[in-house]
């Protein structure tokens, strides 16, 4: 789930690379954004249910979330969005807690990065189910993009 992103030299604040930030495993908020990389969205990224769902609805939900977010920002005079670090850390803990009840997180598979020598073993997809994920995203939006810093 990180390979395509690591093949691009993505740089955030102060020139820090995404690969450097995710050296110990990907950290995202809702699988859509990562702290330190303002205005950067990922579609079906780590921390989202993407690969464990029918990809078309996942992609559509992400595109709708992002486009609605951009519209909200324009309507409210914002030009920058970035997840708050605490929101990102809390989401990561939730993703791990949900994964820990499954055997998938213990298997040597690409889900944990076992297909890449030296890559940290981290279960990256959100396994809590697509409906539950959508509810969480909708709650974030309903609460004024809770967990995000807007400027």
Residue ranges and their predicted role:
Residues 11-46:
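E1/E1-like adenylate-forming module used to activate ubiquitin-like modifiers
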Residues 7, 19, 148-151:
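Intrinsically disordered, low-complexity, compositionally biased regions/tails
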Residues 8-10, 18, 81, 110:
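Short clusters of hydrophobic/aromatic residues that line enzyme substrate/ligand-binding pockets
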Residues 2, 32-34, 102-104:
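A generic structural signal for short, solvent-exposed coil/turn residues
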Residues 1-13:
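Flavin (primarily FAD) binding-site architecture
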Residues 28, 41-151:
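C-terminal, flexible cofactor-proximal segment of oxidoreductases
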């Amino acid at each position: 789930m990180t390979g395509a992103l690591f093949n691009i030299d993505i740089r955030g604040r102060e020139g820090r690379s995404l690969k450097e930030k995710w050296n110990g495993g990907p950290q995202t908020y809702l699988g859509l954004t990562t702290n330190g990389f303002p205005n950067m969205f990922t579609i079906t990224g780590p921390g989202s249910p993407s690969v464990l769902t029918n990809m078309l609805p996942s992609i559509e939900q992400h595109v709708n979330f992002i486009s609605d977010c951009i519209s909200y920002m324009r309507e409210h005079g914002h030009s920058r969005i970035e997840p708050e670090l605490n929101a990102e850390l809390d989401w990561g803990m939730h993703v791990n807690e949900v994964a820990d009840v499954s055997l998938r997180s213990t298997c040597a598979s690409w889900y944990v990065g076992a297909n890449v020598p030296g890559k940290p073993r981290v279960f990256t997809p959100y396994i809590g189910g697509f409906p539950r994920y959508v509810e969480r995203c909708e709650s974030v939006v309903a609460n004024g993009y809770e967990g995000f810093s807007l400027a």
